[in-house]
Amino acid sequence: MGTETFNRMYKYRISGDKYVLSLDNHVEISAALAAFCRDLDIRCGAVYGIGAINEATFRFLDPATKKYVDKTFAEQMEITNLTGNISRKDEAVYLHLHITASRRDYTCVGGHMLTAHVNGACELVVERFSCEAGRRFDPETGLNLYDF
């Protein structure tokens, strides 16, 4: 296993092409993960994780209108699953993240994760792929799809 490394938003360890991350409390997950990918020049990869959040905005794509409907949740929730991929769009880090979070009453909410603020812990695994994947806008779907 590699050396533990520290940053302003995260700590991590390296194991081959995989990175085990612990995000700092109160950081925004997308911002911290994007900073990590920029810092380590990860251009293509996968991410999954768990944790706890207290404010998050999720998105749902309405395929009829090709518009996202955003909803913000301002409550303590457990991340039961965070899954996504890492690529680049116009040379910038592009994260495509989906999340499911459990509420205090054990119901779950989820969708495309726009933002989520750590409140407790957030533990992620990032796998770096040796290929590169870009993104391009697809007018038919209204999505930024892989561009190989």
Regions found by a protein language model. Give the residues of each.
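N-terminal intrinsically disordered, cationic/polar leader segments
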Residues: G2-L95, T100-F148
